[in-house]
């Protein structure tokens, strides 16, 4: 049976989800305050914010498959919050590195980037997240158009790939299990995306094949569904 929440229920679900997204940040804030993050609290905080960036990014990517499997189309209305939460934790991850780890020392940061390329990969992932966060509104969809907006937001998969590479490169060989699990989950999500595209479009189009119209319809509908109907003035 398909569950379709009323507007009031959906508002309650969004409020509950928002509160849940705050829990990791509150946990680490309490850990800093109570000095319970271990021998190297700054490293624990930086890594924790990075892991939760990946967690919320992956939850964002899971929305479309879950909507398809369950028939709960209202899940799209939660995707923007999850995506912006991933960006917020990405900002905290970057901030803890620049401020608490490097103390805004530009020379030290430059040397760190040169010696530790995984930081460059992480920074690239963050830079790719910026336009996605800045274009997460109805105004952005109207300005860009549904097709271009959807094409831009496919960069979320590149962000996820770079995030996993960043994590794999960061950890030591004895601690590879967690990033490998993220890599496997990402492979499943990417595989689902490819299968879904083939199902909608047929085989990958060649130059002589005219572009299909149907995917554009889905793009517009999904973009609007993810943000909710704009209020009429």
Swiss-Prot record:
Keywords: Cell inner membrane, Cell membrane, Electron transport, Flavoprotein, FMN, Heme, Iron, Membrane, Metal-binding, Transmembrane, Transmembrane helix, Transport. It is a multi-pass membrane protein. GO terms for biological process: protein repair. It comes from the Bacteria. Pfam families: Ferric_reduct. One of its GO terms (molecular function) is FMN binding. This is Protein-methionine-sulfoxide reductase heme-binding subunit MsrQ. It comes from Azospira oryzae (strain ATCC BAA-33 / DSM 13638 / PS) (Dechlorosoma suillum). The lineage of its organism: Bacteria, Pseudomonadati, Pseudomonadota, Betaproteobacteria, Rhodocyclales.
């Amino acid at each position: 049976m398909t569950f379709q929440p009323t507007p009031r229920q959906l508002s309650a679900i969004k409020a509950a989800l928002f509160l849940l997204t705050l829990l990791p940040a509150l946990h680490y804030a309490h850990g800093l305050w109570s000095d319970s993050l271990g021998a190297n609290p700054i490293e624990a905080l930086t890594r924790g914010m990075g892991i939760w960036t990946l967690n919320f990014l992956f939850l964002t990517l899971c929305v479309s498959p879950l909507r398809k499997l369950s028939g709960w189309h209202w899940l799209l209305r939660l995707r923007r919050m999850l995506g912006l939460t991933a960006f917020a934790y990405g900002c905290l991850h970057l901030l803890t590195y620049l401020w608490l780890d490097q103390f805004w020392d530009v020379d030290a940061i430059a040397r760190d980037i040169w010696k530790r390329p995984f930081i460059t990969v992480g920074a690239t992932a963050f830079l790719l997240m910026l336009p996605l966060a800045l274009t997460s509104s109805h105004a952005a969809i109207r300005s860009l158009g549904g097709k271009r907006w959807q094409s831009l937001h496919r960069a979320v998969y590149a962000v996820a790939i770079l995030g996993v590479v960043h994590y794999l490169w960061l950890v030591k060989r004895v601690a590879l299990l967690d990033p490998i699990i993220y890599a496997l989950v990402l492979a499943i999500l990417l595989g689902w995306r490819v299968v879904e595209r083939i199902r909608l479009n047929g085989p990958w189009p060649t130059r002589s094949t005219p572009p299909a119209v149907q995917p554009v319809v889905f793009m517009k509908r999904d973009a609007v569904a993810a943000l909710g109907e704009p209020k009429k003035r």
